[in-house]
Amino acid sequence: MRDILFRGKRIDNGNWVEGCLIKRKYYGDVRYYIGFIEVTLLTKVEVIPETVCQYVGITDKNSKKIFENDIVKTKYGRLCQVVWVSSPYYQCWDMIGLESKHQAPDWRDIWYKDNLYVVGNSYDNPRLVESDETI
C-alpha cells in the first residue's frame, strides 16, 4: 500500500511539516493544516496553502522523500521539477526539465530512484525554476 503524505510550510515560522492534509472552512475562509502524531496526540499546524505538496511515493538515492514541486538532479545531470499530473482519466507524478526543453528526463531518470537526488524545491529555491542556474 502506498503512503498518502503531504508537506507544507507553517504559517507561524516557515518550517516544513509532513503529515496528513486537513482542509477546513472557517466562516467562508478555507484554511489548510498538516496533522501529525506527536507522542500520542494528533497535532495540527496551519500551513501556507500554496506550499502544500503531495509525496510521490519514492525516495531519492539518499532515502529522502520526493514531493511534488521538489527539484531533483538526475544521474545524467538533468535538473527537473517534480509535478503532479491530473486529468479526467488518471493522476500521477512526472518530471519536467528545467534547463532546456531538449533535456527532458527520460524513463531511466524517473523509474530508477538511485538516479535522482533532491536539490531543493520550487518554494525555497525559486531561482532554479525561473532560470538556467545550475547546481
Where does each model-flagged region fall?
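Secondary-structure transition motif
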Residues: 1-135
